């Protein structure tokens, strides 16, 4: 083909440049590759010859360029082949990466299972309170400067099981609290106060509590070289360094030094724990010391006195006369404390009002502007315990008098109409049903200790003894003992879970009362949302509980293996828990240990609550004070020992929602004390990632995790129904859940009554605990 035969495609008007632009390769001169070459083609504006094409600074004849087309097409073909080859290689690498990621995930799950087993096994040698071994260099909260930030797995998933902790139950409610004060110089008191105010946890205490804490600390001195704290020993004292220098070490490795003004050991005043580091005096040192029992007495006494005082004030208000003690108690919880200087108008006549006030200390003057008089007339003076503004809670908003604070000032407790409405509902409609007061009083009159056999199915186990029970496999281990899969009288077609608790461990941790409470509460319950207790046994080494078995395994294990749950899955498991909590709360029982580890999956895929070691039955309107629970789940009022009730379970429910959707609890750090500090900062300080948990679920969490227990969703007049009505549950089939017709999101694979594949594998237990003969378990 001649050059003249292709004028339209190769020559005329620079068309060759346009055609060649589809190809590649540079014939020298222009450089920059095929596209670079053709991008430079242009018709010279000063050349009359239309068959010439300029490339950069060079000019070519069109027929010369046409000769290059076959070469360019061949080059393009070679490049295409190379690209296809490279693409095949890349696709192979991508496939291999995907396979390796799957293998890594599988290995990670196996590592998680082994880690869970090892950590639970290690609990046997852990602290009396059941705290896990220290995961990273820290000093058992021996000094704030040595505390570290949370260290989470890269994917944000918490892979280790969470360990519950507990102090010994206190009985300060039933006996007067006698506190001994120790003399100190003004400088010593100021030094202790300054140290307390610098401590993230202790500075959260009320002013009165800090004053009492300072007064009750006693002096201790140690010489250079003396051990103040030794790793592994039980701890029950807090220290403030007054003079000298100490060093902190773990397993012989130096962690740091502490000097005057440092607080150490604050975790030990909350609950039973062993020291995870040693502290040795480098010089002669002076310390101020506070015992755990004294700290608990200080915090509990103030909380009890304040709550009792408020209850006394509120029961005297005429419009509250017919409210139950439980509702008045909730009102006391949500009242705010305010202070007004002398001369300040707390209320002005004629203005709209929506708050009720109780005078906590000081005086107020009541004046009223009478028509025809130039000056307001003084009506009366109100003192401590008096109240005013109660009609505003009924909607009568216009104030009819002035209320003026008297010098030097007045402290008042306030309740606004909105909070009152949420707690009580419409007062007029409430007056139509005062039966709750009588019903609740009946609950209080019931003796708390006798066990009720509520179901006929327990009768068939009346003659069963420990000799009739055969162990088949291990379902779980911990510092308390083990849980075994068992059958009775050799019948493997019907299996059970046998929980064996070490009596010596129970006595060492002073948990006898909790163990009996667990037995009594579980014997009184009969619902599909709670694991059934059939029978209890005891011998010289253990107390035993024969329980309903749930072979679907722990919800925590499923969560660990999946990483996190979507909205639909989480909603189902939250709804199951809510049904169980409602049942318990109707019986005035607070659960206090909600977490995925204590939620078991039945063969049907439905969830049941287990482990009632921290559950407690309360009298109506009353609180309990023992520090117990799982660090990541405890509420602020438990940490600060303000007294707690069922509202603590609503806080835990919010944390539970977060963990199911995020794969880890929202409050989490490298040590419990740091975790408690995060909790006390509040849920509003959290940055909850929205890629896994949406705005609606986040809103529910924040309503459940209010700092004030009385403000939490579920604590109001609507109770649990207020939670069910939240937008996150919109469209949820509650009737289907209760009738068990709603399909569960996950159906466990269980092949037979002895199938334990949904549980981790545990090694045999060769540790034989010593005998325990104190007799505390008589009647168990």
UniProtKB/Swiss-Prot annotation:
Residues 730-780 form the AGC-kinase C-terminal domain. The active site is at residue 593. One of its GO terms (molecular function) is metal ion binding. Its EC number is 2.7.11.12. Disruption phenotype: Increased size and extended lifespan. Defects in chemosensory behavior, egg-laying, synaptic transmission, and dauer formation. Impaired movement of adult animals in response to sensory stimuli. Loss of adaptive behavior to long lasting exposure to attractive odorants. Normal initial chemotaxis response during a first and short exposure to attractive odorants. Loss of chemotaxis response to the repellent odor 2-nonanone. Defective chemotaxis in response to diacetyl and isoamylalcohol. High sensitivity to benzaldehyde, which is retained following pre-exposure in contrast to wild-type animals. Keywords: ATP-binding, cGMP, cGMP-binding, Chemotaxis, Coiled coil, Cytoplasm, Developmental protein, Kinase, Magnesium, Metal-binding, Nucleotide-binding, Nucleus, Repeat, Serine/threonine-protein kinase, Transferase. It is an enzyme of class 2 (transferase). GO terms for cellular component: cytoplasm; cytosol; nucleus. This is cGMP-dependent protein kinase egl-4. The gene is egl-4.
């Amino acid at each position: 083909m001649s050059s003249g035969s292709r004028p339209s495609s190769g020559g005329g008007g620079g068309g060759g440049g346009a055609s060649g632009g589809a190809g590649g390769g540079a014939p020298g001169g222009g450089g920059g590759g095929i596209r670079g070459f053709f991008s430079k083609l242009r018709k010279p504006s000063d050349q009359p010859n239309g068959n010439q094409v300029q490339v950069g600074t060079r000019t070519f004849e069109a027929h010369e360029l046409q000769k290059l087309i076959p070469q360019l097409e061949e080059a393009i073909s070679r490049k295409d082949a190379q690209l296809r080859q490279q693409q095949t290689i890349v696709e192979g690498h991508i496939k291999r990466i995907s396979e390796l990621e799957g293998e890594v995930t599988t290995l990670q799950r196996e590592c998680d299972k082994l880690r869970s087993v090892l950590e639970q096994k290690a609990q046997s040698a852990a602290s009396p309170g059941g705290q896990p071994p220290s995961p990273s260099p820290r000093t058992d909260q021996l000094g704030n400067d040595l505390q570290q930030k949370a260290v989470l797995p890269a994917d944000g998933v918490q892979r280790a099981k969470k360990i519950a902790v507990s102090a010994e139950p206190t009985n300060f409610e039933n006996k007067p609290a006698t506190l001994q004060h120790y003399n100190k110089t003004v400088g010593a008191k100021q030094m202790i106060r300054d140290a307390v105010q610098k401590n993230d946890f202790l500075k959260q205490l009320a002013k009165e509590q800090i004053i009492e804490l300072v007064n009750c600390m006693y002096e201790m001195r140690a010489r250079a070289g003396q051990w103040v704290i030794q790793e592994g020993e039980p701890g029950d004292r807090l220290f403030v360094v007054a003079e000298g220098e100490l060093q902190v070490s773990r397993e012989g490795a130096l962690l740091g030094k502490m000097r005057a003004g440092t607080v150490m050991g604050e975790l030990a005043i909350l609950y039973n724990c062993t020291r995870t580091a040693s502290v040795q005096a480098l010089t002669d040192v002076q310390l101020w010391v506070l015992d755990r029992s004294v700290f608990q007495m200080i915090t509990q006494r103030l909380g009890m006195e304040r709550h009792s005082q408020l209850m006394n004030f509120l029961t005297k208000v005429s419009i509250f006369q017919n409210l139950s003690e439980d509702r008045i108690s909730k009102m006391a919880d949500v009242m705010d404390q305010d202070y007004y200087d002398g001369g300040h108008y707390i209320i002005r006549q004629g203005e709209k009002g929506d708050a009720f006030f109780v005078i906590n200390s000081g005086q107020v003057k009541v004046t009223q502007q009478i028509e025809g008089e130039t000056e307001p007339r003084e009506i009366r003076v109100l003192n401590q315990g008096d109240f005013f503004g109660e009609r505003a809670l009924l909607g009568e908003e216009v104030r009819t008098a002035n209320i003026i604070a008297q010098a030097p000032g007045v402290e008042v407790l306030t309740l606004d109409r909105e909070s009152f409405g949420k707690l009580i509902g419409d007062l007029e409609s409430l007056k139509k049903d005062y039966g709750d007061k009588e019903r609740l009083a009946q609950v209080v009159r019931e003796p708390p200790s006798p066990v009720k056999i509520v179901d006929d199915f327990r009768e068939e186990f009346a003659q069963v003894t420990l000799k009739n029970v055969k162990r088949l496999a291990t379902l779980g281990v911990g510092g308390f003992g083990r849980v075994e899969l068992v059958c009775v009288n050799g019948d493997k077609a019907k299996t059970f879970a046998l929980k064996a608790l070490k009596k010596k461990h129970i006595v060492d941790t002073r948990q006898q009362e909790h163990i009996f409470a667990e037995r009594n509460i579980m014997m009184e319950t009969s619902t599909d949302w709670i694991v059934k207790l059939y029978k209890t046994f005891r011998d010289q080494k253990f107390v035993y509980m024969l329980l309903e078995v749930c072979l679907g395994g722990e919800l925590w294990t499923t969560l660990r293996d999946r990483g996190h749950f979507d909205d639909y899955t989480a909603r189902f498991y939250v709804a199951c828990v809510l049904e169980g909590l409602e049942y318990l709360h109707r019986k005035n029982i607070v659960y206090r240990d909600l977490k995925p580890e204590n939620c078991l999956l039945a063969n049907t895929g439905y969830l049941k609550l287990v482990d009632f070691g921290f559950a407690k039955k309360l009298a109506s309107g009353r609180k309990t004070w023992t520090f117990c629970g799982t660090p990541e789940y405890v509420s602020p009022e438990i940490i600060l020992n303000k007294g707690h009730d069922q509202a603590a379970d609503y806080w835990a429910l919010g944390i539970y929602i977060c963990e199911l959707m995020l794969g880890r609890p929202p409050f989490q750090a490298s040590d419990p004390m740091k975790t408690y500090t995060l909790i006390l900062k509040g849920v509003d300080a959290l940055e909850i990632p929205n890629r896994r948990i949406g705005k609606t679920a986040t809103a529910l969490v924040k309503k459940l995790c209010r700092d004030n227990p009385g403000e939490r969703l579920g604590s109001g007049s609507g109770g649990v129904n207020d939670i069910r009505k939240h937008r996150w549950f919109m469209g949820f089939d509650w009737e289907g859940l209760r009738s068990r017709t709603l399909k569960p999101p996950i159906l466990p694979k269980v092949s037979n009554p002895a199938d334990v594949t949904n549980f981790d594998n545990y090694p045999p237990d060769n540790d034989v605990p010593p005998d325990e003969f104190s007799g505390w378990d008589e009647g168990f």
